[in-house]
């Protein structure tokens, strides 16, 4: 069997001037996902691309979009939707880098930033808009036609991390976003994800309108997303009452004290609490979760990348897609409900052939989750042997005191009030939107009845 000869960017249809930009960014040949989809996108096909984090997915859609935009540089050419602010920022940065020599105008539309400024940016018709569904939906609901008119003529819709965007969480916001876009037959739609679900695969069989070529589905290793072979996976079984004390014990034993680590939790309140406890205990820690404003999140990631903080406490916002360097240790303070989320979390370590370690803190309520994870990864987690109950008990008092103080600080700061206000604002906006929709339906029904008479 002959070895596969990798195609060049030129073979895929990328112009010399854009190849020169790639070389300036030290990108010399396409990755598997880029090789698999770029030519098909340039041919005008709708596309689903599946590849793991760090495989070059963003350039796989950014390059053909810029290539086609250069031949027709008008209006809002492409809308890229992604589930988190951090992913949106990274995509926006890649478009900025790839389009730097072309006067490509791009706008970032995400929460945590000035909404009026974003409305103005959108009304200026940038060539590429990178957005989270919630903030774009807010702008659509609260602004007039002048602001959103450019979205009605886009040539490309990209949904990055499509498996998450197509979950019920984003359904209402996506409905509002899609309501101002061209019909599917009048644009190219590109879906990219690290996990190609059966529901996404079924989209391949939907008939294409306006004589469009069949949808192109290309997967790289996504049917077997797996943990790295160099990863050591273990667990400690503890009472739920002493999880925080065991966590501090884990972080401070000689084997782990100097390691860079990400601690994953399931809720923003837990992330804030654990971060505050570790900060009060004078560990070099930072945090990342959706309750932080954008400036705080960027600063926090910067501290972790620069190793000013050795520990990052995070929700699953940090498990996929973010430009975070490989760490030496991943700790699951909370086990995820979905075993695939476990794989994405522990995939933050043992990258590029390096060794790494993951430790899951398991309580009496987590046994079924552990079994599901073991079935998914195809191996048993080993028991972590470097902690002891006697040593953990030495931390109980100071951890309990720190937890009490951290809880009081969160109450004093009104932690969670920002989300509550945002939800109230969104409910109000949805109420107005629904009234307008219902009004439109009644008017349409009335007109229909009038016609029938």
From Swiss-Prot:
Residues 230-393 form the Helicase C-terminal domain. One of its GO terms (molecular function) is RNA helicase activity. One of its GO terms (cellular component) is nucleolus. Residues 38-214 form the Helicase ATP-binding domain. Residues 413-453 are annotated as: Disordered. Keywords: ATP-binding, Helicase, Hydrolase, Nucleotide-binding, Nucleus, Ribosome biogenesis, RNA-binding, rRNA processing. ATP binds at residues 51-58. It comes from the Eukaryota. This is ATP-dependent RNA helicase dbp8. Its EC number is 3.6.4.13. It catalyses: ATP + H2O = ADP + phosphate + H(+). A motif (Q motif) lies at residues 7-35. The Q motif is unique to and characteristic of the DEAD box family of RNA helicases and controls ATP binding and hydrolysis. The gene is dbp8.
